[in-house]
Amino acid sequence: MLVAAFFTLFLVTCQPAVTAQEKVNQRVNRAATPRAFDCQLSSWSEWTDCFPCQDTKYRHRSLLQPNKFGGTICSGDIWDRASCYSPTACLRPAQCGQDFQCKETGRCLKRHLVCNGENDCLDGSDEDNCEDIRATESDCAQYDPIPGSEKAALGYNILTQEEAQSVYDARYYGGRCETVYNGEWRHVRYDPVCERLHHGEDDKYFRKPYNFLKYHFEARADTGISFELYVDGNDLFSKVKNDKSHSAGVTISAGLTGSPLLGTVGVSGSEDASFLNKLSQYNEKKYNFMRIFTKVQTAHFKMRRDDIVLDEGMLQALVELPEQYNYGMYSKFINDYGTHYITSGSMGGTYEYILVLNTEKMESLGVTSEDISSCFGGFGEIQYEKGKINAQGILSGKHCKKSGSGDKEADKMGQAVKDIISRVRGGSSGWGGGLSQNGSATTYRFWGRSLKYNPVVIDFEMQPIHEVLLHTNLGHVEAKRQNLRRALDQYLMEFNACRCGPCFNNGKPILEGTSCRCQCSLGLQGPACEQTEQQGAKADGHWSCWGSWSPCTAGTRERRRECNNPAPQNGGAPCPGWRVQTQAC
């Protein structure tokens, strides 16, 4: 009897301890896991003819099915190129009439731009063999181009929400010497190389490229410093994505794409995918996220609407597109130069970083989020009030430092911060990079000053890429414009995260390359976030992909999508935007 009792006690006391994760697994509702889908690519298309000016030929294949829910991934790219030999000489068709034609790209120039001392052709052929060079009026070479002009000239991909190659030629002036007055040129500037203060005499005027209709410097103005606390990294990611969508003058969730994140095949990762991967490292209940954000505007611009001069790289790629529709070549063009181009916007920079807070450490140290908000953010003496951080007067930066030199309170708060994710855009690389390492008021102040001369585009309006062809002086491009429009519809569908669903319980569908995954919130498991601890929790709906266009009737056609990818559950929000889209035809 004693032996039996001892053996029973041994069984009870000597079983392996149940971990916290195993306890969670025991509570999780075991919903049915969706069937895995393997990635499928189409067969390669036939090679194109050899392009004589490139000695290159192309082929492509389509993404028939991205892998999802643990399916087998695809290897390789969807575009391919190979060297070739063409017996045809590289000759640009004469299409400029009495005007000058650039040798490499075929750009047409008025005769007064030839031998004017400026390279209006990328290859400089307009300045070859010049006996008499006519200098541009007022010797405009002394002026630097307006800050940020190269950034505004870039295309934009609304799927990845990233910049593409140049659409406008930001180096073309058309023989004009139009300058923009910088009202802050008298202000004292700091030269970090020489470590001295000086007046910016050289920055009194900047030269405006031809494709810019307007450019106006503005006194630095920020949007105020916002302070946001998130329990779930997915909610933080959605907020960041929505802010980017609104900055781009389009609400992605209500438009053609209807997806939180889409990655383009052929692009080696995206900024947002990298950010999400960092957040995923802290997908545990003990971590919260503090977002500190401000946007600084330094200039406003508007691009020329008509007679746009395209970047010569884009012009050359456009010339080489076939007249007959070839989705592979047109989709590669879109992937290179963007789905859209910028028509107007604002220059400046954004200062944003995410503090990963260890709530268990905070509780043991007696530290609150309000305490931490007064220490971090790169602004020094900042006061927290009603969910906002407000800079008061001159920011001294003496209130708190993470690496507190003898400051016990600062050290305590620093211990509560597990990680800092920096997302600074704009400004000189030295000061911008320094913000993530040194959050002093001096560093922030000089970063803000450097934005005037090293800005990025922070808010902008845009148009579909095929529309730019309507506003150039190029002839005989209507067939290619229609092909580009058709390819854009197909491209937006092929690389759309709607193909990745359904992700249940507010999981986020993500398409990276040819692979889908669902980013799950806290307490969710499974490849489709289908396993949850909470019964009856609200889950928002997500759109299916758009269906095919209907036949053209009375000058219009339509297509539909359904809010079933998945449908809303337990009172969750319906899908935003329209179920039916109409288009002139």
Curated annotation (Swiss-Prot):
Residues 21-30 form a propeptide. It is found in: Secreted; Target cell membrane. Glycans are attached at W44, N438, W543, W546, W549. The keyword Zinc does not apply. Residues 136-499 form the MACPF domain. One of its GO terms (biological process) is complement activation, classical pathway. Residues 38-91, 540-584 form the TSP type-1 domain. One of its GO terms (cellular component) is membrane attack complex. CDD domains: LDLa (cd00112). Membrane attack complex (MAC) assembly is inhibited by CD59, thereby protecting self-cells from damage during complement activation. CD59 acts by binding to the beta-haipins of C8 (C8A and C8B), forming an intermolecular beta-sheet that prevents incorporation of the multiple copies of C9 required for complete formation of the osmolytic pore. MAC assembly is also inhibited by clusterin (CLU) chaperones that inhibit polymerization of C9. Heterotrimer of 3 chains: alpha (C8A), beta (C8B) and gamma (C8G); the alpha and gamma chains are disulfide bonded. Component of the membrane attack complex (MAC), composed of complement C5b, C6, C7, C8A, C8B, C8G and multiple copies of the pore-forming subunit C9. This is Complement component C8 alpha chain. It comes from Oryctolagus cuniculus.
